[in-house]
Amino acid sequence: MDRFSNLPDDVIYHIVSFLSAKEATCLKFVSKNFQNLVTIKRNVVFHHWESFKNFVDGLLAEPASYRIKRFSLKLVSMDFAQYNIVNDCLCNVLKRGVLDLELDINVKEDYILPSDVFTCKTVVRLKLGCGFVIDILPKNALLPALKTLILDSVRFYASDGCAFTRLLSASPVLEELVIDRLNWEHWKGSRFVSSPTLKRLTLRRKEWEPEPETWTDFESVSFDTPSLAYLKYKDVIPYGYPIVNLNSIVEARLTLPREVEYDYWLNRSADPSNLIRGLKNVEILSIKVLHTMDLLFYNFKEAVPVFENLIHLSVTSEADFCWDPLQILLEKSPNLKTLTIEGPLHYNFYEKLDLEAVCECLLGYSFLLSCPIKVLKITEFVGDIGEIVQMKHVLGKLPCLELLEVHVQARRDDKKLQIMADLLMLPRTSSKCKVKVHFS
């Protein structure tokens, strides 16, 4: 028997006012009366002020049974006279069981988000951008359902404790945090990512315009994220990493570039040692910028731990970029299975007249004799004689190799056939090694 249908309409409205849009959707299938009384908007998106203003006028007149599942507001600009209209709308939407809230408003620093944004019980995904300044969170800040938080060009200040730290603390089930167009040095307060539940973290710096005076406010970054499995980190290295807890890390993608102000970086006492040690449990490691290898694994080689769990390593390379840091990484990775070279194979670029010459950093490739990798992938291979000769050295040293996968840049059929023949004729130490060639 459908007991809900026998309830008075005002009681049904009252019940629905406590439900998220998802829960209200479920109840619509339980009770026929609910189907008639409950309205659920799945997707509400606005990019223009006029259409938004008309919506707000109608929204404020809707009963509590009008629920919204996803609300997205994107405004190129907003002046002071529009603040109250936007805030009235947001407060109303937040009471309608919204699950997905996206605010992309180009605001001035004097705009303050309504406190209801930080006390919503239903929101599961929250995106804030671009240009919000979050200074103070309400004392009762709590987002009990929030699992994904995306911040785009958002700055945090610290009038009453660090607003960023408080926001993370108010999100007890947070699983994913994305901070885009990041500029730590413009924040006021700690750069401390702390969450016991966080599983995925993406930090992407907007740009690097070094202003020495800002570095006094950018002394350190810390990670206390014991459940974190995925880290995508594009930034410059601060003075240090006092706390690094990445015990559950599975995959890390690092982009820590050496920019035009590298001399300034060297003059600072920056020390990424704790970050390097904190990655010791990583299983998949990707290094996307060439000089990240030098900055982390060569300049601070003493801090490099043994990567017992590392099975897949991907590094960016160039033909004339020495493999000193790669050698250190390989020697510290006793269980590595797959090595991907994002770029060309390194060889003695400056000794083209001596095809058998081996760059000093390779030491005759002897360090490969104890390398356990089974799969070697090279994404850029032209097939000139220097590359072929150095490939011979590599294949002659890797005892466990089972697959060489090469992506060749060639268009002419005769060139493709020649490269294929050259690669297949190379002697291999491993009798199990097969060669797979992709042409582009």
Swiss-Prot record:
Keywords attached to this entry: Leucine-rich repeat, Repeat
SMART domains to which the protein is assigned, alphabetical: FBD (SM00579), FBOX (SM00256)
Signal peptide per UniProt: none
InterPro entries membership: F-box-like_dom_sf, F-box_dom, FBD, FBL60-like, LRR_dom_sf, LRR_FXL15/At3g58940/PEG3-like
UniProt xrefs under Pfam families: F-box, LRR_At5g56370
Protein name in the entry: Putative F-box/LRR-repeat protein At5g15620
LRR repeats: from-to residues: 4-31, 126-153, 156-181, 194-205, 210-235, 264-289, 318-343
Domain called F-box: residue spans: 1-52
